[in-house]
Structure formats: C-alpha cells, structure tokens
C-alpha cells in the first residue's frame, strides 16, 4: 500500500492565486511520482477563511470586524478575495480536476491538534506558509506542523518566508518548531539566512515545486485562453506601482502589442480577463510575446516556457511590507539578476 502524505499549504489562496494552486499541483505530482499518495489538507486559519457563498455584505463584515486579523490581512482579503467572486469558478474547476484533498476541513490550529489527519508523513510548503506578515506578524504553528503526533515524519519542502526579516516575536519560537522536523529546506536564501541567524541552523535552499516540472509536463495541464491576439503582453500585477503601469503602456504602444491581464488586484489599471484560471494562466504565459509581472510564479513560468519577461518589484525597498526577496532570490539563483 502506498504511503499517504498530508500536505499543508496555502489552501486559503486556492480561490484566486495562480501560484498557490500550481505549486500545490507540482508538489502533489512529484510526491505521486515517488510512489506515495498526496492529500492536501484544507487548513484555513480563523480570520483568513472566506465563505464565498455568503452574501457580499456579510463577507465584508466578517472580514473587516475580525479582531484576529491584521490590517494588511483584512485589506488583502477584501481586495483579492471578497470582491473577486467571478474568479473562483475557474479555480475550483482546476482544483477539482487535478488536486486530491483530505475530506476534513480545519479552520484553526486547535482543530488540527484535536483531530490530526491520519497520514504516514506530513509536508509543509511550498508557497509563503512561513511568512509572518500573512499571519498577522506571527508564526502560524499549523504550518510548522506542530499538531503532528510524535513518531511521524515532518518535512518542510521549500516553504517561503517571503520577507528579508521577521518580527522579533517570531524569532523566539522558531527553533522549537524546526527542531521537530525530520527534513528541512527553504525556498529562498533570505529565509535560510534568517534561520541561520535566529537558530544557528544551516538548511538547504530548494527550488519551488513548480520548477521541478519541465515545460512538457506543464503542457499536460496548460490551456491556451480563447480569443487571444496573435501577439500580446501578458500582465500579472499585484502591487500599486504607477511606474510599472506606465512602463507596460509604453511598451504596448511602442511595439503595438495589446495587453492581456490576469486578475490579481482590483487596483490594477488594466482590464482583467476573469476567464483565466490556472490552466489558462500557463497557456497565456507560454504564448505571450512578453510577460510583465511583479509575481514570483509568473517569473518561474516565464523561465520554464522561455518567454521573454520584464519583472518589477512589488513593494518599495524601504516600505513597511517588502516581499521582493522572492523574485530577487530566484533571479539570482538563475543568474538573471
């Protein structure tokens, strides 16, 4: 009988985040190729969970008045989840077709501890599961697999901290979490540096799961979006950079290339195509003349498909929130910086 592996990853982003879904698909595929049975655990921390079937007013109220959520978390959910209902169906179609989920859903770490899933081993990662900014400037014990019973292997495969530094309150309990892992790795050198400084541990930097599959393997799920122009700029933008907007428009005008945009943030000033799901996201990047993005996974798939790309920083280097290290690390790793 194949060993059953539980995967803890950013399932709260599966309704609208291409990278979150595609890295989960890649990790599941690689685990399956090892002869194991991957099962994604639906873990949505209280305060991050959004009931998409609820009326819009109730969803706004439950988000805005949640005392357990940081201001950044509230803004992210309102902008990227609550208001973008039309995106979810194309994502749910993909996840139903390609991902295998454990039948229980956990809304809190306490629920995980009280009723842990019965797997032979657990993997946390990839994606930004160790990013304290996302979790209200604190570590989320669930993503450090603290609920796993003694004697069962805990594995961290390329989780991302997503930042160059973590709050002081996150440093004190980090070593206690990491000491319990049978196998450790991290996605960015910046994360490895943080762990070295805080815990005195040297852990390897590993590729994001999406980079473990080649273009031919991704072609098995990639779909070219309908009605695409023959040549176009594919834009995937989270940040607010007006300079990025201006640059993309200049390139579009100079080379007479229309802009095709995937939905990321409603603040983006380009018309988004809401029919683009994870499969179409791959197809849009593969067939683009140029990709312009401030996204880690847009960078990765541009590299995989050898599509010319222009990557922009998402945040100011001096800003309160700075997650640019993810793009910087991957470009340095590939000698493209």
Regions from the language model: what does each represent?
Residues 119, 181, 288:
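An anion/phosphate-binding loop that grips the pyrophosphate of nucleotide cofactors and donors
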Residues 120-171, 205-272, 278:
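Active-site donor-nucleotide binding/catalytic segment of nucleotide-sugar enzymes
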Residues 300-337:
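Catalytic binding pocket for nucleotide-activated donors in carbohydrate/polymer assembly enzymes
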Residues 181-188, 292:
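A short beta-strand/loop micro-motif in the catalytic core of glycosyltransferases
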Residues 192-210:
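Helix-loop-beta element that forms the nucleotide-linked donor phosphate-binding surface
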Residues 175-179, 285:
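A conserved, positively charged/aromatic
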Residues 286-292:
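Acidic donor-binding loop of glycosyltransferase active sites
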Residues 5-18, 22-176:
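Aromatic- and Gly/Pro-rich donor/ligand-binding loops
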């Amino acid at each position: 009988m194949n060993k059953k592996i539980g995967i803890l990853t950013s399932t709260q982003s599966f309704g609208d985040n291409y990278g979150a879904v595609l890295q989960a698909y890649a990790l599941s595929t690689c685990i399956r190729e090892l002869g194991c049975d991957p099962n994604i655990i639906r873990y949505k921390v209280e305060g991050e969970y959004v009931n998409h079937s609820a009326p819009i007013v109730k969803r706004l109220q439950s988000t805005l008045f949640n005392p357990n959520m940081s201001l950044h978390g509230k803004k992210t959910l309102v902008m990227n989840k609550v208001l973008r209902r039309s995106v979810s169906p194309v994502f749910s179609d993909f996840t139903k077709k390609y991902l295998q989920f454990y039948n229980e859903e956990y809304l809190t770490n306490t629920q995980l501890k009280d009723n842990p899933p019965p797997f032979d081993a657990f993997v946390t990662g990839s994606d930004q599961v160790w990013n304290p900014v996302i979790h209200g400037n604190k570590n989320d014990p669930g993503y450090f697999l603290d609920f796993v019973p003694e004697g069962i292997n805990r594995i961290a495969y390329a989780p991302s901290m997503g930042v160059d530094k973590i709050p002081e309150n996150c440093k004190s309990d980090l070593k206690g979490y990491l000491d319990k892992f049978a196998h450790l790795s991290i996605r960015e050198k910046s994360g490895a540096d943080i762990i070295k400084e805080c815990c005195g541990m040297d852990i390897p930097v590993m590729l994001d799961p999406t980079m473990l599959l080649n273009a031919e393997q991704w072609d098995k799920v990639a779909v070219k979006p309908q009605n695409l122009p023959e040549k176009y700029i594919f834009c995937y933008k989270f940040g607010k950079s007006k300079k990025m907007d201006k640059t993309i428009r200049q390139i579009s005008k100079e080379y007479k290339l229309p802009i095709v945009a995937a939905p990321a943030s409603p603040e983006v000033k380009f018309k988004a195509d809401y029919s683009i799901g994870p499969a179409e996201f791959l197809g849009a990047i593969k067939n683009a003349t140029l990709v312009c993005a401030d996204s880690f996974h847009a960078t990765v798939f541009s590299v995989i498909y050898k599509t010319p790309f222009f990557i922009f920083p998402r945040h100011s280097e001096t800003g309160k929130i700075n997650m640019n290290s993810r793009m910087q690390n991957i470009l340095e790793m590939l000698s493209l910086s």
